[in-house]
Amino acid sequence: MRKTVIAGNWKMHMTCSSAKEYIDKFIPFSKEFPSDRHVVIAPPFTAISTLASLLQGTNIQLSSQNVHWEDTGAFTAEISPSMLLEHDVRYAIVGHSEPRKYFSESDEQINLRARSAQSNGLIPIVCVGESIEQRERGEAERVIRRQVEQGLEQTDLTKLVIAYEPIWAIGTGKTCESNEANRICGLIREWAGFSDLIIQYGGSVKPANIDEIMSMSDIDGVLVGGASLDPENFARIANYQSI
């Protein structure tokens, strides 16, 4: 049985004080979430400690926005699994299109991050997705398959989440058609060779389209960017209604 994972990625937003204001508003909404939905927030690293304290005793889990493959060392600007575990972090996003784009992260590095997360008890959320140029050239499936096969090598597929995020839909207001997103998620599950693989969709997810997205048979959750920055909007997404 595949579980439902609804994750909000705050990216480089929210100070500790604004994060506290957000959580104070969000927690009352969270009491209405169905018990079988795993709701996750990925704040910036500076706010993790604050949220860890505020979320104690709630049904909301923490994720980091990245994790390094070494536990200590001369890796400026990185964060290790043990640093995250100290603050009750449960998930770690790896391979998001922004680090891939701005810091030239390779599939091999993303695989190292995912394996490090798993070996330390974190659940990696491994992001994959194509650019608009790759899609227009008919390369989308080849690109995503490579990301899946290289990114998941030597990982435990029972203890990770895949997030399909077409790059052209992230922060643009353009959403991949639900049927097409569902088709790609089905292919990802096929390429991975594991029918119970948990797969999210990400890319301009918002309250107006969440019910349709979550009605798709091969989509198990969402990775939300901009819409997760508003507590009421993210609560509506987490409390989606099945069609």
Swiss-Prot record:
GO terms for molecular function: triose-phosphate isomerase activity. Its EC number is 5.3.1.1. It comes from the Bacteria. The active site is at 96 (electrophile), 165 (proton acceptor). One of its GO terms (biological process) is glycolytic process. It is an enzyme of class 5 (isomerase). Belongs to the triosephosphate isomerase family. Homodimer. This is Triosephosphate isomerase. The lineage of its organism: Bacteria, Bacillati, Cyanobacteriota, Cyanophyceae, Synechococcales.
